From Swiss-Prot:
Entry keyword annotation includes GTP-binding: no
Tissue/organ expression: Calcified shell.
Transmembrane segments: none
Phylogenetic placement of the source organism: Eukaryota, Metazoa, Ecdysozoa, Arthropoda, Crustacea
Name this polypeptide is given: Cuticle protein CP498
């Protein structure tokens, strides 16, 4: 079974559904919630529904 929350590291995110998202150089996660993450460059990553 897939984990119920994202795994977040310095260089990327593994979403609850198993999707790997690599962060651009110098970009970090400034806010993480149960369904998305806000990045320091203003972008956001929406996690897929489980």
């Amino acid at each position: 079974a897939a984990p119920s929350k994202a795994t977040v590291g310095e260089s990327g995110i593994i979403t609850p559904g198993g999707r790997l998202i690599q962060l651009p150089h110098g970009v970090s996660i400034i806010l993480e919630g149960p369904s998305a993450a806000l990045l320091s460059n203003g972008d956001f990553v929406t996690y897929e529904s489980s």
